[in-house]
Amino acid sequence: MSRAKRKIEHIQHALSTADQGASGFDDITFVHQSLPDVRMNDIHLHTALGELSLSSPFFINAMTGGGGKQTFEINKGLAEAAKHCRIAMAVGSQTSALRDNKQRGTFEIVRKVNKNGIIFANIGSEATVDDAKRAVDMIEADGLQIHLNVVQELVMPEGDRDFTGVLLRIEQIVQAVQVPVIVKEVGFGMSKETASRLEEVGVKIIDVGGLGGTNFARIENKRRSNIITYFNDWGIPTAASIVEVAQTSPSLVVIGSGGVRTALDAAKAIALGASAVGMAGPLLRTLVEQGVEALVASIEELHHDLTLIMGALGAKTIDKLQRVPLVIRGDTHHWLTERGFDTKVYSCR
């Protein structure tokens, strides 16, 4: 099967496959503050990912590209919304365009629409330094995502089976490209062990891509004749993954993604240690079903709601939101305790 056809199948299955709701955000409860001592007009949403300054912690995470007209139109619509709302955007894997010049336009449209926006290029862990540079140049990217998707590849009928040398390639890319590198998972979460190894080779930004959002094991299983059921619920829930990375490697910048559906989810992700939050599935569904205007309205509502939540917590900035007290309970508390983390760090600060 061609990469272009596979991209279309991924979009179709992503739209028809519901998020599994296992992100762990329901286990997080904020400690209410009756004297927040803030003026709502003083609250702002600016944040930073390393050297990149963002006007909002929300960004459109990697989804698609390389599937002809349909993915061209999706990326065009996403870019229009990102431009209007002044938020960053990542494109989907550019491997298809690196192999087939005819697919370049499905990615280049993002920069054409949003000439001054912050845009992230995207490659797989099998990519070379040359691939990385070409992907960045293709869309004049401000940052580069390298996605880790071992489980997806294992379930994918035509997926890769050689995962050696990945860390070395990442190290070489980090040293060679002139933009910040973000290493991300695609729905299975990042462990403290993985975060430490990535930090050792110079990675400074990690997108945990946790369990709870778009499930690529389920998507790939829909393309199989013999289903591999044991990978359908595989992974680290997003809430736990954020803590694993943030608490193990405090110098790393963390992005929370995977099952972020609401401003409350986003606030919880930030309070656990994320500096930004990526959203994909809910935004894709809104765009495809209702159009660009509805997507813009949805993003603006997220901004409005996050501001209200920050007001209730007395947090004027994203930095202050990262330090508000919260209580972790349920499965997330159990996971973190078993993994050696003290959740009182969050409840008593």
Swiss-Prot record:
Signal peptide: none annotated. Its cofactor is FMN; NADPH; Mg(2+). One of its GO terms (cellular component) is cytoplasm. Substrate binds at residues 6-7, 152. Pfam families: FMN_dh (PF01070). Mg(2+) binds at residue 153. One of its GO terms (molecular function) is magnesium ion binding. It comes from the Bacteria. Keywords: Cytoplasm, Flavoprotein, FMN, Isomerase, Isoprene biosynthesis, Magnesium, Metal-binding, NADP. It is found in: Cytoplasm. FMN binds at residues 62-64, 93, 122, 184, 214, 259-261, 280-281. GO terms for biological process: isoprenoid biosynthetic process. Transmembrane segments: none annotated. It catalyses: isopentenyl diphosphate = dimethylallyl diphosphate. Its EC number is 5.3.3.2. SUPFAM superfamilies: FMN-linked oxidoreductases. Involved in the biosynthesis of isoprenoids. Catalyzes the 1,3-allylic rearrangement of the homoallylic substrate isopentenyl (IPP) to its allylic isomer, dimethylallyl diphosphate (DMAPP). NCBIfam families: IPP_isom_2. PANTHER family: ISOPENTENYL-DIPHOSPHATE DELTA-ISOMERASE. Belongs to the IPP isomerase type 2 family. Homooctamer. Dimer of tetramers. This is Isopentenyl-diphosphate delta-isomerase. It comes from Geobacillus sp. (strain WCH70).
